[in-house]
Amino acid sequence: MKDYLVKALAFDGEVRAYSVRTTNTVSEAQRRHDTWRTASAALGRSLTAGTMMGAMLKGEQKLTIKVEGNGPIGPILVDAHANGDVRGYVTNPHVDFEGTEQGKLRVYQAVGTEGFVTVIKDIGMREPFIGQSPIVSGELGEDFTYYFAVSEQTPSSVGVGVLVNGDDSILAAGGFILQIMPGAQDETISFIEDRLQKIPPVSTLIEQGLSPEELLYAVLGEDKVKVLETMDVQFNCTCSRERIESVLISLGKTELEQVREEEEETEVHCHFCNERYKFSKEDITNLIENL
């Protein structure tokens, strides 16, 4: 099954809902960064939340998420675009902890329970929108829920889950975001709160193979949900050799000549996708000649 996202309304417009399958997306991130189990879960949850938050934007708009906790995984960075493209990395990919007796990964131990979630939105204005909230649990779903309440004043519920196999490969990943719209009835809010208490964890639902639509039906009730739009999502980095060449050219002739003099081979590393671009002395000479 391909990865895709669903945008929906529920309860006659009282609730805005997003749901996504990100199994392939998180698998690609795990492959590129060689993340261990707990790091994969943390990065995967962040990518899943970022994908849905990106889908709230329009056109060429994009956002960056920084999760900066006090745990050994270090900062997590995610870039997400309105078109479904997402990329991201963890600072320390080789972090893992023993799971609970129920097999649940201890993501909070990797992320830490103190720190901040920062969201930077580039929505075409002169200055980006920057929102920040403290980490409240380190499990990330709760932390993004709190972010929406504090920074965007939008009562929300964020559920994100990643299942990791014993060999570090990704079994399943996905999640949902529910947002209460202004004027929603108390009965609607109570109904959703009750459902959220009763449904299995997100990771259990996605392990059962539920589609994004079925995930929303499980949370809200099939008769309450109206699907508005679906779109493909994927791990996609914007870096390329041409872009890196442009960055090198921007250094100017003097600095490029110094690089050519000092290095047999110049390597530029993209943290987001772990791609490495190598430039020989001849490559650098060609760049200088094109200035």
Curated annotation (Swiss-Prot):
Cell location: Cytoplasm
Disulphide bridges: 237-239, 270-273
GO MF, any single term: protein folding chaperone
GO cellular component: cytoplasm
Post-translational changes noted in the entry: Under oxidizing conditions two disulfide bonds are formed involving the reactive cysteines. Under reducing conditions zinc is bound to the reactive cysteines and the protein is inactive.
Keywords, ordered alphabetically: Chaperone, Cytoplasm, Disulfide bond, Redox-active center, Zinc
Gene3D superfamilies: Hsp33 domain (3.55.30.10), HSP33 redox switch-like (3.90.1280.10)
GO biological process terms, semicolon-separated: protein refolding
Keyword Cell membrane: no
Main location: cytoplasm
Keyword Chaperone: yes
Domain of life: Bacteria
Residue ranges of coiled coil: none
InterPro entries: Heat_shock_Hsp33, Heat_shock_Hsp33_C, Heat_shock_Hsp33_N
Function summary: Redox regulated molecular chaperone. Protects both thermally unfolding and oxidatively damaged proteins from irreversible aggregation. Plays an important role in the bacterial defense system toward oxidative stress.
NCBIfam families attached to this UniProt entry: PRK00114.1 (NF001033)
Family the entry assigns: Belongs to the HSP33 family.
Name of this protein: 33 kDa chaperonin
